[in-house]
Regions:
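Conserved recognition-core residues within compact binding domains
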Residues: 2-5, 9-130, 137-190
Length: 195
């Protein structure tokens, strides 16, 4: 009797294993370089990754994708975006938490993606500096959309973006929306207000 049950369980497990989807292969690392205590990985598909924080196994691409290096290899991390709850406020998983930016959970800590990208590819922010999303979309954490500015510049750029959105809405012209304006043009607009 016991033997039959054991054999049945083995068969059931084998059937379950057949139904499981095959795992996607991990990206293969072509080479790794360490310079200034910061690791740089190049994948076979041409993507270059940099380590944001030394000692933490998070690697970032210029496109804002986050990978973690584990014992099993390099794995893409899930970036969590905040959803609007019934009250129209942004929240994570329906629970308000005051967190506005996309983040990654890694080893029981939350890391904002835009901060990790600037740490990996630009430099750490100094006293009185902030990270500016050029097109005003905080969910867009690509390196091309991020820059380090002073608090005053960030405030002025936010005012300009609000005005552009308002005029686009009033004139019903989507080409005036900051999300549709090329970044080179936005940077020229912002260059006029720099301190």
């Amino acid at each position: 009797m016991r033997r039959i049950c054991k054999e049945q369980r083995i068969k059931e497990r084998q059937q379950l294993n057949k139904r499981k989807k095959p795992r996607r292969p991990f990206p293969a690392v072509e080479y790794a370089v360490v310079a200034d205590n910061q690791k740089t990985l190049r994948l076979r598909n041409g993507t270059v990754l940099r380590q944001a924080i030394p000692g933490v196994g998070l690697y970032l691409s210029q496109g804002g994708r986050v990978y973690s290096l584990t014992a099993f290899g390099l794995r893409p991390r899930r970036i969590r975006f905040l959803k609007k709850n019934n009250y129209g406020k942004k929240s994570a998983n329906g629970v308000p938490n005051g967190q506005r930016y996309p983040y990654v959970d890694f080893r029981r800590k939350k890391y904002d993606v835009h901060i990790l990208v600037t740490l990996a590819w630009l430099r750490p922010c100094r006293e009185g500096e902030e990270i500016d999303h050029i097109n005003g979309n905080i969910d867009d954490c690509r390196l091309i959309n991020l820059r380090i500015v002073t608090k005053e510049e960030n405030r002025r750029c936010a005012q300009i973006l609000r005005r552009l959105r308002k005029t686009a809405k009033q004139q019903n012209d989507p080409s005036l929306d900051p999300l549709n304006i090329p970044q080179s043009r936005l940077l020229k607009i912002f260059a006029d207000i720099t301190v």
